[in-house]
């Protein structure tokens, strides 16, 4: 597989944005399979970035020889949401990134049945949020997903300040009740 590191100016985020892409080797994929290539979005966990899956897993080795495009975007600690502090990661992922990638990779599928999403921890939260709120993904997988905030207390988790959590999700009383 080819490992591509892409940085482009995101109109939604109003900044340069980093995305890693694993792309099938042309010599390992039949010509007929080079059209409408399935795509998997892999979302990193908290404190990770678009390099996490490549550095901490065998994803590249395991997918070698397959006909699958793997997209690994960076959202810092933005929880794959449109944050209160101005970074609209949800909108960037749900709307902008697939269109940008389609321009880079015209043979990448646009079909829901061939588009998948998975994530680790914070990325598990993001993948279910994106899969349930859009009609883009046919399958979603959450690995140790941060899916329940009912008993969550930022103070007890040592995971950022209350101001950080308000910046991502708004007032704590509102998002723990949702």
Provide a role label for each language-model segment:
Residues 1-178:
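Non-catalytic cap/lid and distal C-terminal segments of serine-dependent acyl enzymes
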């Amino acid at each position: 597989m080819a490992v591509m590191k892409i940085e482009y100016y995101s109109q939604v985020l109003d900044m340069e944005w980093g995305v890693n892409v694993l792309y099938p080797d042309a010599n390992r994929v039949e010509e007929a399979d080079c059209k409408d290539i399935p795509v998997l979005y892999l979302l990193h966990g908290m404190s990770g970035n678009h390099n996490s899956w490549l550095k901490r897993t065998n994803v590249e080795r395991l997918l070698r020889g397959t006909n699958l495009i793997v997209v690994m975007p960076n959202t810092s600690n933005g929880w794959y949401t449109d944050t209160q502090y101005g970074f609209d990661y949800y909108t960037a992922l749900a709307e902008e990134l697939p269109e940008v990638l389609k321009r880079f990779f015209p043979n990448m599928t646009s079909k829901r049945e061939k588009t998948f999403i998975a994530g680790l921890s914070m990325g598990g939260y993001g993948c279910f949020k994106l899969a349930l709120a859009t009609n883009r993904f046919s399958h979603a997988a959450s690995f140790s997903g941060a899916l329940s905030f009912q008993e969550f207390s930022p103070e007890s988790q040592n995971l950022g300040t209350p101001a950080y959590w308000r910046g991502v999700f708004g007032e704590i009383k509102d998002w723990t009740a949702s």
